[in-house]
């Protein structure tokens, strides 16, 4: 669930994808090669259509630096994912077995340590000052390139108003490390 919108009027990496009938906005994390991408369907009820084409949503987009009027909701996502069964299905079984586990490289002898569980906790908080991810990295949204026009001249901005459900994902270089959706907005 999300609440209050906050507004930006500045330069962003932006893309309009007619095949997906959606707009894409890139919010770079300061000082890192990581960014959050927001995929906003052009239609207010277009989230299901985007989800049905998720591979295309996650594919690289043809971003250009555009002057935008952006309105984003504040939202917070917290999740805990149990990985033990997934890891076992992938063949990582011995580390969970008391008689076969060999974690002697960490401490003690073979059999002294065993993995009892594996969890992944994720925390994303989008607020007016920026994005906090995994409760460890604080970022501020800012333009990534200098404006191609003199500072006194501002072209008419394009609109990116996230007032309906959308998909977001965080990528490091070309790898998606987290994805989610905002499906309910309160105004």
Model-predicted segments: where are they?
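Secretory/exported precursors with cleavable N-terminal leaders
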Residues: 1-187
């Amino acid at each position: 669930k999300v609440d209050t919108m906050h507004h930006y009027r500045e330069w962003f990496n932006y893309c309009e994808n007619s095949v997906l009938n959606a707009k894409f906005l890139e919010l770079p994390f300061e000082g890192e090669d990581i960014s959050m991408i927001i995929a906003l369907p052009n239609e207010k009820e277009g989230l299901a259509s985007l989800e049905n084409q998720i591979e295309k949503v996650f594919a690289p987009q043809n971003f250009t630096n555009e002057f935008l009027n952006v309105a984003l909701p504040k939202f917070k996502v917290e999740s805990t994912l149990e990985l033990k069964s997934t890891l076992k299905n992938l063949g990582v079984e011995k580390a969970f077995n008391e008689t076969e586990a060999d974690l002697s490289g960490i401490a003690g002898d073979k059999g002294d340590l065993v993995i009892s569980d594996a969890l992944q906790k994720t925390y994303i908080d989008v607020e007016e000052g920026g994005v906090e991810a995994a409760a460890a990295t604080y970022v501020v949204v800012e333009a990534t390139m200098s404006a191609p026009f003199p500072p006194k001249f501002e072209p008419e901005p394009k609109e990116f108003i996230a007032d309906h459900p959308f998909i977001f994902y965080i990528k490091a270089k070309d790898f998606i490390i987290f994805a989610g959706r905002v499906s309910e907005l309160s105004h």
